[in-house]
Amino acid sequence: ESTARLINRGYELSCYDEAVRRLRNIGVEIITHMIIGLPYETKEDILSTAEYIGKTANGIKLQLMHILKNTKLLEMYEKGEFKALTEKEYIEIVCEIISILPREMVIHRLTGDGNPDELIAPLWSLRKLQVLNGINHRLKELDIIQGIKS
């Protein structure tokens, strides 16, 4: 909840839970977006969020936090209040998330695209194919399949 307030999400977790309940009651499948790399979040926070989504949604879209021009996040970043994830850190976290998500959950996206004209950091995210290949390579290297730890 503290991260939600920091990024001005605009609603509490209970609102998400209620929306999920109502949508399920009418047969709608739930796909939840998850931003990875938010300020002050630890690896444990990230994995806890992924586990929660794994229990509540049918699908997930993973998104790296992009620091864009003219945003409060940029101001915080420039003051050194937090650091953007490295490509290696992102790949490691995504692999761990995949390992704990239920096997039946659809993973709709492993990373997103930042507008190159607006993106300040992390610039490595502009090389999307390289990131996806890095995730695939690391999954094979660690012998991870989706749900292996769920």
PLM region descriptions:
Residues 32, 49, 71:
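Ser/Thr-centric signal marking residues that sit
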Residues 24-30, 56-58, 101-105:
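Short, well-ordered coil/turn segments that N-cap beta-strands
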Residues 59, 66-150:
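Auxiliary Fe-S-binding modules of radical SAM enzymes
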Residues 1-27, 36-56, 75-88:
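Conserved non-cysteine loop/helix-boundary elements of the Radical SAM core domain that shape
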Residues 2, 61-64:
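Bacterial c-di-GMP phosphodiesterase catalytic domain signature
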Residues 35-36, 63-67:
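Histidine- and/or cysteine-centered catalytic micro-motif in compact active-site loops
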